[in-house]
Swiss-Prot record:
Residues 25-41, 91-94, 150-161, 207-241 are cytoplasmic. The chain crosses the membrane at residues 4-24, 42-62, 70-90, 95-115, 129-149, 162-182, 186-206. Keywords: Membrane, Repeat, Sugar transport, Transmembrane, Transmembrane helix, Transport, Vacuole. One of its GO terms (biological process) is protein homooligomerization. Disruption phenotype: High fructose levels in leaves, especially in vacuoles, due to impaired vacuolar fructose export. Increased root sensitivity to high levels of fructose. It comes from the Eukaryota. Forms homooligomers and heterooligomers with SWEET1, SWEET2, SWEET3, SWEET4, SWEET6, SWEET7, SWEET8, SWEET9, SWEET11, SWEET12, SWEET13, SWEET15 and SWEET16. GO terms for molecular function: fructose transmembrane transporter activity; sugar transmembrane transporter activity. Coiled coil: none annotated. It comes from Arabidopsis thaliana. Residues 6-92, 129-212 form the MtN3/slv domain. This is Bidirectional sugar transporter SWEET17. InterPro entries: SWEET, SWEET_rpt. The lineage of its organism: Eukaryota, Viridiplantae, Streptophyta, Embryophyta, Tracheophyta. Induction: Slightly induced by the fungal pathogen B.cinerea. Accumulates in response to nitrogen deficiency and cold stress. Expression follows a diurnal rhythm with a peak in the middle of the day. Induced in roots by fructose (Fru) and darkness, thus triggering accumulation and release of vacuolar Fru, respectively.
Length: 241
């Protein structure tokens, strides 16, 4: 069983790495144009937070080194993304991004780690507390896929929900959910089970609306849809994250 979970975890690592790298095209555009334009930094800041907490969880939880390796990679990549955003963002946005990043990726992780280590002497309880926090954050971050699905139903168009991103959300959730079952890890199982369900729902919606006649978009809805298109790569980041 341990050997099976190892191979499943390796597959999960490969898929998660591909998902972490999926925003490269977006940031290549930012670098090329030397402007962040209308792109948002929050998805990458939140993904960095999730990756950092899961890295710590993998380090302090026996047998979960595959979780720490992929999320350590993810934290590094997301740090690069956020740094590029800060470099090319206008001054007013830079200051706002620094404030949010410091709050979520400096103060919050430190507070979470210090609080769990102060509250519990048992290492198992400490790791479980971090796992609970990480799983909760992942589930909250799934609000973005829900927004993408709402846009598809409203517009009857899958333009803003690319097939491959939905497919990898489905596949990533499935692989890590299986890994969690083999490892008997409920903190990995719950968020990745949710990711699998949302990925399945998105693939079903894609099948229903891929040939449907799109409905005209209002300006407000167009902006929402555009945001989804620009931020879709990070909407899957609750990946196991």
């Amino acid at each position: 069983m341990a050997e099976a979970s190892f191979y499943i975890g390796v597959i999960g690592n490969v898929i998660s790495v591909l998902v972490f790298l999926s925003p490269v095209e977006t940031f290549w555009k930012i670098v090329k144009r030397r402007s962040t334009e209308e792109y948002k930094s929050l998805p990458y800041i939140c993904t960095l937070l999730g990756s950092s907490l899961w890295t710590y969880y993998g380090i302090v939880t026996p047998g979960e080194y595959l979780v720490s390796t992929v999320n350590g990679f993810g934290a590094l990549v997301e740090t690069i993304y956020v740094s590029l955003f800060l470099f090319y963002a206008p001054r007013h946005l830079k200051l706002k991004t620094v404030d949010v990043d410091a709050m979520l990726n400096v103060f919050f992780p430190i507070a979470a780690i210090v609080a769990t280590r102060s509250a519990f002497e048992d290492e198992k309880m400490r790791s479980q507390s971090i796992g609970f926090i990480s799983a909760g954050l992942n589930i909250i971050m799934y609000g973005s896929p829900l927004s993408a699905m709402k846009t598809v139903v409203t517009t009857k168009s899958v333009k803003y929900m690319p097939f491959w991103l939905s497919f990898f959300l489905f596949l990533n959730g499935a692989i890590w959910a299986v890994y969690a079952l083999l490892q008997h890890d409920v903190f990995l199982l719950v968020p990745n089970g949710v990711g699998f369900v949302f990925g399945t729902m998105q693939l079903i919606l894609y099948g229903i609306y891929r040939n449907a006649k799109p409905v005209g978009l209002s300006n407000g809805l167009s902006e929402i849809a555009q945001d989804e298109e620009e931020g879709l790569t990070s909407r899957v980041e609750p990946l196991l994250s």
